[in-house]
Amino acid sequence: GDIIIVTMLFMEPHINAVSDALAARRDHCDALVCCMSAPEVMQYTRMGRFTMDSEPSGPIALLKRLRGTPKDGKPAATGERQLAMLRRLPRILRFIPGTAQDVRTYFLTLQYWLAGSEDNLARMVNLLVQRYAAGPRAVLRQIAREQPPIEYPDVGIYQMEGRQRIVDSADGIAEPEEHSGTVG
């Protein structure tokens, strides 16, 4: 059972510490999501019929072709273009049946994770439960609802108080409450 999420594993000692456990649990958990990690960790990803342990085929092969190839030694895509593609892909994959739906869920999981707010992490867990909860956890699928990732501005102001925590202009900053200083 369970849904396992693995991120940011690059250092060899860390990989070695969990690699055997991931391999043992991979085929016995509801889903194993590995993202932004070393290739030897990424290969453990299994979400429905989508796995990363084999040669790309179907939707993944198509996505690699769409990505393009480097020209004149320049990178194929800047970080900004890659993020734009990451946001666009789930909208495209929504209309392709089969394994593409699991690939879509993988890219949505990346979006939730990269946005990194409490709300997005809760939405990510809801999505994964709705899609992959099995066995005694299958009843949770009826409760969990897929909600799109909350998108935040690339550049913004973080504020602890206020309706929105991240705003992209000074107009969205909450007015401070009137406080008078005290002495002693």
Regions found by a protein language model. Give the residues of each.
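An N-terminal assembly and electron-transfer interface module characteristic of large anaerobic redox
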Residues: 2-184
